[in-house]
């Protein structure tokens, strides 16, 4: 079992080329697993964690409802935002500057074969990261992701999640709002959930800007511990 996760920080990169890159890495792992099984080999499979910041883009999961996008094509263009219907779980979400997007592309057979546990550990890494900033966050029953003010009328989402898995290989991942322009969420019903707000780390801390590299290092620390991995 290979518990090393290769970290790649892609910086600012458009959604489409990043999605294609994810698919390449994902398919390479799947292909090697098929080869291992067919030829009775035991070649180690790779694991990756991609960090990226996307230009303005809305993405809709495979079970999502297009009605949760409140803009037409011309309005999207006017906002300089792209739109993609993609192959992850979940509904609609927004990605943009000031948001830390993480795509773990893992062979879960290197760790554990349990998608539910995988999602809960991704959430836990965010909960622990936010706790380091003095914020109490948690899960909202039946709604994947991480929230503040759970169980109150002021529940607000700070981290969205949506993944795809096949043959125990994962792709897509999480999006943590750090210094993001929350106005872009007004153009969607985030994750198809009505009546709940969206927030970001800088808003919750009452500061203009949070150091995103510092946040990433905390996420890496917690993922390393939770997955008993080595992130290199």
Curated annotation (Swiss-Prot):
Pfam families referenced in this protein's UniProt entry, alphabetically? LplA-B_cat (PF21948)
Q: Which GO terms of the cellular component aspect does the record hold?
A: cytoplasm
Which taxonomic lineage does the organism of this UniProt entry have? Bacteria, Pseudomonadati, Bacteroidota, Flavobacteriia, Flavobacteriales
| Protein name (Swiss-Prot/TrEMBL) | Octanoyltransferase
The record's InterPro entries line, in alphabetical order, gives: aa-tRNA-synth_II/BPL/LPL, BPL_LPL_catalytic, Octanoyltransferase, Octanoyltransferase_CS
Residues given in the record as substrate binding sites: 88-95, 160-162, 173-175
**Is Magnesium one of the keywords?**
no
Source organism of the structure: Flavobacterium johnsoniae (strain ATCC 17061 / DSM 2064 / JCM 8514 / BCRC 14874 / CCUG 350202 / NBRC 14942 / NCIMB 11054 / UW101) (Cytophaga johnsonae)
User: In the UniProt entry for this protein, what further remark is given in the free-text comments?
Assistant: In the reaction, the free carboxyl group of octanoic acid is attached via an amide linkage to the epsilon-amino group of a specific lysine residue of lipoyl domains of lipoate-dependent enzymes.
**Compartment(s) of residence:** Cytoplasm
GO:BP terms for this protein?
Answer: protein modification process
* Catalytic EC class: transferase
Q: Which cysteines are joined by disulfide bonds?
A: none
BPL/LPL catalytic domain: which residues? 43-231
Q: What is its EC number?
A: 2.3.1.181
User: Which residues make up the annotated site Lowers pKa of active site Cys?
Assistant: 157
Q: In which pathway does it act?
A: Protein modification; protein lipoylation via endogenous pathway; protein N(6)-(lipoyl)lysine from octanoyl-[acyl-carrier-protein]: step 1/2
Q: Which family does it belong to?
A: Belongs to the LipB family.
